Amino acid sequence: MIVMKFGGSSVADATCMREVAALVAEALPEAPLVVLSATARTTDTLFEAARKAEQGDLGAALALHRGLLQRHRGIAGELFPDGLPEELDNALVELGGELDLLLRGVALLKELSPRSMDAIASIGERLSTRIVAALLGAPWVDARTVMRTDDQFGAAQPQTREVAALADRLLRPLLGTDRAVVTQGYIGANARGLTTTLGRGGSDYSAALFGAALGARDIQIWTDVEGVLTCDPRVVPEAQPIPELSFAEAAELAAFGAKVLHPATIQPAVEAGIPVTVRHTRVPHGRFTTIAAEVHSGRPITALASRGPVTVLTVTSANMLNQSGFLASLFQVFAQHRISVDLIATAEVSVSLTVDADAPLEDLLADLSAFATVGIARDRTIVAIVGEQLKLTPGVTGRCFGALRDINVEMISMGANEINLSFVVKEEDAKAALQALHPVLEAGLDPDGGRP
């Protein structure tokens, strides 16, 4: 069997859903499990409606609710011009009623808990999958019966052993030649049956977990680009699809801002040894990227990525000199405040680290000031150079920084696996940095014409 995951842009309207149905029909001999996101913009609309309700503006929240349901009924009406199947019509009515009750509850309490937000957010995937399942005439499975998670609403962690057992019991019997099964990405439920979500972009993660649990031959991520590109095409129009990526390269790119894959997607596939392919819904037989355990591209640099804004914290203390355990104490403070660190660079008496720009720093800084002084640089961007051959190619880092000679690099960090060289620049310099580096990657030439 295979897993076919389609993102929001791939199920945005009736035309897109027909294209998805055609792709699934072509893959029926491979017993596809179809995993869908909400239709484009739906999750954002649900979040906005929830915030309006929390603010006490129930009228605005319900107006967004009506617009959302009307849009989905319009899509369904285009797909079924002679009338909606009774099961689909009933499902849309039920989901509309559920959303209405949830929004009214939030407005009444003027409180939007993560638990309530997850319940509201789940409506999007349940709407899109109901319509596509009806279009395909396929069984519809509520992912919440299979995707068992912990209680961390908004960013729930799947309980992989339970997911595997539930998938084997509830999904596998439905799979068979010439039949698809439709379920949702992004959503799950805890042990008490309360709805959870895996965080924004979590549909990819769902697809990988389902694929690993069922021993899929291939996990296909269908999106609106021809695979993973060498760089963000909005920044570098010359960016090209990458035919093959290693699991390690893909994980680094996802972690450092490549938008095609959710960062957590790769691990279940790695553990199960299942290739992941990233394909274009509108160009199904065009170029695509295969992500596998081993690849042999021969390129010193495979791709570039960036992530920002981030904040750089420089922690300085004379206690670092000749003292063991300083870094352990430092990171214990970050752990206590549940703040993740992306990059780290050390000197004799200082450590520079990057954290997300929206990380809550006030209490962290108060604790750090007990044993160090802390400098803060905001509005920075991490630029990452990723490639399996990076560590094996003499001089490539020199050529990269030669390309950046007109850009001030504030921090440098080499990944422990030596396939990721990252550096920090001011946010306004990130675009120029990527555009300067891409010719080194794409043509194998530095800006002055020298060969790597």
Protein language model regions, located:
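Positions that flank functional sites
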Residues: 146-148, 226-228, 284, 349, ...
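Acidic carboxylate-rich catalytic motifs and surrounding loops in phosphoryl-/glycosyl-chemistry enzymes
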Residues: 144, 279-282
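Short, mixed-charge, low-aromatic patches
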Residues: 3, 85-94, 126, 162-166, ...
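A conserved regulatory-domain signal marking ACT and ACT-like small-molecule sensing domains
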Residues: 285-452
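Structural motif
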Residues: 1-2, 31-34, 73, 138-139, ...
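Nucleotide/pyrophosphate-binding catalytic subdomain
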Residues: 1-262, 266, 424-426, 445, ...
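Acidic/polar loop patches that form or flank catalytic/metal-binding clefts of enzymes
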Residues: 262, 273-280
